[in-house]
């Protein structure tokens, strides 16, 4: 994506998002097709069933599970273009896999986002969202009522990397939020409904303050899921999920997701 305030997602992370966002790819590309089938104008039930994947003639009716670590190409030149980020395509499933991309597109549709990525866990999604915005010397403003693992991630793990944080109440006033900002603040973070306190974040106010300071708002939407709340509609720029919880629903799979909204981001700031 193009933005005068290009805060985040560089190198490979940027490339993966750009694959799904850039208009210059051919209309026959997988990424273009995924974007076409985000289906923002459809109801939630239809998105849950159909978004992110549309089979062609003779192709699998359901999203196929691609169980391969790597992908074959006919020439080393083809592979070289992939490694140099000059061409789109798959080459290593740790970075990108068709199954994951289709599921990510479905989640982007459900949230009303532009694109999404799957991660190995919800904490991985939060770390990816925050660490690709911040670097050593930067500052985060975060809600104090968040999942304990995320609180530890921000207050302990990221502190070891030179990234500091100020925690504020999820129902803080506009004046209190503004007071938490520093010249080096790069992002705001909160949870729609906190785990486990169940406090509710004032997303609209957090987004307003974040954008006035020219930074994006990241919201963890794990508890409500997009069926019940879509933070992007209230001003969030990035949405994360621990799909381990309600999205999986069976306690059988650990996973996460990171979703991006850009029009541009953050919100014409």
Task: Provide a role label for each language-model segment.
Residues 261-269:
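Single conserved hydrophobic/aromatic residue that forms the stacking wall/gate
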